[in-house]
Structures are given as C-alpha cells and as structure tokens.
Amino acid sequence: PWHIDINDFLDLKKNSGEERRRAHDLFPALWLNDLFMERVQADDIWTLFDPYDTRELATLFGEDFSSRYEELEKNESIIKEKVKAKNLWKKILTSYFETGSPFLCFKDNANRANPNDHYGVIRSSNLCTEIFQNTEPNHYKIKFIFESGESISYEEDELVTVDSGIEKPAKKVTALDSLGGLPIYVVEKEKVDGATAVCNLASVNLSRINTKEEIDRIVPTAVRCLDNVIDLNFYPIEKVKRTNMRSRSIGLGVMGEAQMLAEQEIMWGTQEHFDKIDEVMEAICYNTISASSDLAVEKGQYAEFQGSKWSRGIFPQDHANAEVINLVDRGGLFASAYEWEELRTKVKSQGMRNGYLMAVAPTSSISILTGTTQAIEPVFKRKWFEENLSGLIPVVVPNLSPDTYAYYTPAYDLNQTILIKAAAIRQKWIDQGQSLNIFITLDKASGKYLNEIYMLAWKLGLKSTYYLRSQSPEVKNDVEDRSMECVGCQ
C-alpha cells in the first residue's frame, strides 16, 4: 500500500467514474505489511512512493522492510506523498465493501511462515488467495563480453566500479569501459526467466474423512497422487515446468467442514468447533509432512530442501502466536495425538519431496459434485442456487433433516470474527493459506465492524482473505454467484 497511485488502484472496479480508468475484469489485491497496520492502529502518517524509486520494498518484509521504508521516508531526493494511515485504511475497506476487492493479503504473515525463505520471497498470492509460494519476475542481466571470449554478468542495477574509478549501475556501463584491466568488447542483455507458482490441488472431504484413523489412511495416498501430477502434467510454458519441478509444490486442502460439523451436531463458533478443526487439521498436517518425507526417501528430495525451514525442523505450527495457541487447549498447551519431535528428526534426516504442502481452495464446483459443502465455509443458506462457470445449480445442504437443520448456520447469520478465529486455528497447521470469504449483511455493516474483522485477521497471523460478500437483508436473493472464481480452484 505504499504505491503513490494507490487511490486510483482502489477505484479500478468501481461502477462509477471515468470508464477508461476502470478494469472490471481484473482482480486486484493489496499486499499489506505490519508497518502499515501498526500505523493505522496508532493513527499515524503513511508515506506513498513512486515504485521506481523504491523497487527494493517489493522483496523486503518484517524488520528489513520497516527499516528501509523509514530510510526512504527521510530521503528528500525522491517523490513521495504523505497521508493519514487511518484515512487510507478507511478507503481500502470502503472499496472492499463496495466492490468485493481488492483482496487483502498480509505480506509479513506470509513471508514469516514461508518454509522456503532461504530461496526467495513470496511476492503475491493467486486469484483465490490460498497459494503462497516463492515467485520471481522475468528480468534481464547485463553481460560483459571481453575480447578473449570470457564474460561476466551483473544485475541491471548492480553497482560496478570500472577501471576509471567510476561506480555506476551495470546498465550504464558501455564498451568504452574496462574491468580489471580488460577492455569490454561487447555489452549484451541476457534474459533470465523468473519463477511462477503452480497450483497442484486436491481436497480431503471432511464429511467422510474426519477421524485420526481415516486421515492416517487417506492423506499419504493424496500426497503421492499430487506428487505424481507434477511429473505427468502438461506444461505450456517451460519456466512453469522448471519452477514446478524444482519446488515440487502441492496444495492439499479440505472441503465439507460445515457438513462434518452439522452431522456431528457441533455449532459454528463453539469451543467444540474450534477443538474439532484443530484436531482434524493437525492430523492432516502431520500426515502430509510425513508422507512427503517418505516420498523423499523413495524418489528424492526437492531441489531446494537444504536450508529450508523443513530441513531445520521448523513446521507451520511453530509460527503460531500466543493468541492463536490460546484459542484451543485440548489438554495441556499443545496436547497431541502425534509424535512431532520424532517427525522433525525424520524430516531433517530424510528430507522432503515437496517444498509446499497444504492450501485450502474454494472448491465451489467439486464440493457440489461430491455432495458436500464448500471448503471451510459455513453454508450460504440451507437451500439456494449456486451460480458458477457450470451455470445455475440448485443446491440443498447435504443430509438436511430436523436433526441437522439448526447446525447448518447460514454464513450471514454468524459474527464474522468467528470465521477469522476458526481460520487462525486452521492456519496454525497450514504452510500456505486458505481461501477465506467474509459474509456481511448491509444492516450489520459498519467501518468499525470491518476494521475489527480485518485487524483480527492480521493479528492472528492469517495470510489473506478472499471476497467480502455483502447482502441486503430485504433482498430475498437465493443465488450465490461464484462465476468469477479461478477455474482451477473450483
């Protein structure tokens, strides 16, 4: 949110205003950082910059970002604009409420928990905001070729001291210069392909698979299947194939949470709900990591394993803060049915087959096909019409009966902080993210309520939220439009 054109960015999907300055078919997102959120809380000043003067901010996070940002604020030689952080935050939330975007993603939360922080940085998420993997844009290097045929390459903005004693960016060096006593014969640009994240997704149906024994049996097979997809897939772009083969990233998620809760007569937002999903997600996390480690013995480690958090025995739950841990206490601070220390030793010894493991996709189509509820969401209503890329589909919640009716709480009837807390419990066990929608009726909407929801999401360590879905209480609209979701995540 430090881009000097952020106000125009926030207006991209508005229906009013100059149409040439709108982009209705794009899905913008904001990459929010801790420093901005802290200044919103403190009602402090926020500085906007020209991105060409501050390119390095895109790859920094945490204390490194804050330190560099504050240095740039003091730099009088670059273009900047000062605004009230709270006013900008209000505009962000207003745009989010009016248009459903920009999606809000939390840069520092994502990168702090990045299992492959040794090999790059997470710069963004995907359309459905559950994929968090290292990416890198295509770029050019400057290649100096000497008369002998030898060559050396530098990044375009990397400072080079030529023999005349002048220090300048590599892109400013010419064939009239010399390096190390060698005249430069030719200066060329060489293209370097970046890294593109890939979604290799599957979901465990919690309405059928929700006990320790069932998860122990099913998850290793799911991990093996997803790993096979990487090798068997068709890749239209070579750099996508290279990235996928190098990181071997998969995204095992869940669907059917609402059905599982209803059939077990558990109300949304109760402590029983929190305990149940904590138990289930722990089992999925443990078995996913263990299965990937076993595959590493059989097929080999992924190329970037050495130096990763996996190699150091650091797992997703190690990033959970005290507030999240205190949401669930299953007997002792971290009571568990699994031997986590043994698994850490195993992973450090055997390695991992896959660099990224878990991500919860929206599953708006496959959940209907399999006869369960969508992903991790409460139901839209007990009966409604689902509009997605397949058309308009009549839907009734699974196994609706007098016994389950009360436990299928419609999403718009819930306090949305419950969804945030439940997501934080899941996030404790997920190395990537979740596609998390927020549901608000107009009679409940207020700036204070929206601020409470999204501030809580940031504080509890969530990496993203998806759509902010709003509905007027007077309008009897039984159609839930999901047609704008990513095809791969449906």
Name every feature range the model reports, one short phrase each.
Residues 132-133, 226, 230-231, 301, ...:
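Catalytic alpha/beta core of large soluble enzyme barrels
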Residues 185-189, 236-247, 260, 264, ...:
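Active-site-adjacent structural elements in folded domains
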